[in-house]
Amino acid sequence: MKAVVCHNGELAVEEIPIPEPGKGNVLLKVRRAGICGSDLHARVHCDETAAIAEEVGYSHFMRSGESVVLGHEFVGEVVSYGPGCRKRWKPGTRLCALPIIRHDDEVEMVGLSEKSPGAYAEFVEVSEVLAIPVPDGVSDEDAAMVEPLSVAHHAVRRSGVGKRDVAVVIGCGPIGLSVIMLLKAAGVKTVVASDYSEGRRELARRCGADAVVDPAVESPYNAVKAQRKYFTRAGDLFDEAFKALNLLQVVPGVPWRHIVRFADDNGLTPTGPVVFECVGLPGVIDSIVSQAPLRSRVVVVGVCMEPDTIRPALAINKEVDLKFVFGYNPDEFAETLHFIDKGKIDPSLMVTGTVGLSGASAAFEVLGKAEKHAKVLIDPSSLVSALT
């Protein structure tokens, strides 16, 4: 079969053997695959990522000297089954699958491991138990977007954001746009998006952002202030506390301590917005901690591949919650597909181009400095070799 192989940072279309599905696995004919930011990172930073993965107990992440078929966002149709499968779906049935697979009792990441070729190819092997049938009303293009949207779904759920909270999305690349869509699907009424790129800001509007800001012109937190009263100075917060306690103690005997505790436990005391960091560059987290209102919640979704620095004392003095998120759960993956099927999210809003296998390398170059493009898909049956 034809596949896009990554070796020492170079991408080339090569002929490689069609995978033979192992125990419990299914062979799919790839219909669409998405180019992920993780693939862009893996192409140039895979050795650093592999070292980090080893620290958390995973030793199969790709290395630069290996020949790896990338692609962990995909949809395909059933071709054949390996031994031990339940064979739940007929040949030709379209499936999405979590990109995790077992080979010889070793768990590997599909498309990010030499032993588990990904979906930048005509065929891909997946785990039967992690596969989900695609409803008839969901297009191939939308189905290929389930995986990155699941990352956003997980980030939104882990953030604890409520419908009445104001959410701020810093960075409107594919993950930032996905977070915007999942925030709106979760019922969050006010979503502020921030990006230097005019093209990305327009995509953010299309994906549902209620306010869009160019940070070179205006701070996104100024837009936040227009939505709700937040505190940016500690003195103002202390003053508010004095006023509240004076009011609570006007009537002698009022159990003010219990009232304050109840208010705090139920989110009724002053807080900041929920900020999603979707850039992944050095200095961004510290910038958010510095500029965001007091008691903000910061959710780090963007992957910074370089050592970074924050000022813990500043974060402590502002009582900022800092949370890092990774991946998603199987139920979130399935629910994301359900959201697409029911029209709660529209992945097509962020898909800006499709190429064939021969166009993958050129697409990587464009996406590395994208202004116009956000999400690009690969169609193995297409002859398109360049983005327009």
Q: At which residue positions do the language-model features occur?
A:
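NAD(P)H dinucleotide-binding glycine-rich loop of Rossmann-like/cofactor-binding domains
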Residues: H60-S67, H72, L95-I170, E218
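Rossmann-fold dehydrogenase core element
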Residues: R297-V299, I310-L349
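Adenosine-nucleotide cofactor-binding segment
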Residues: V169, K184-P282
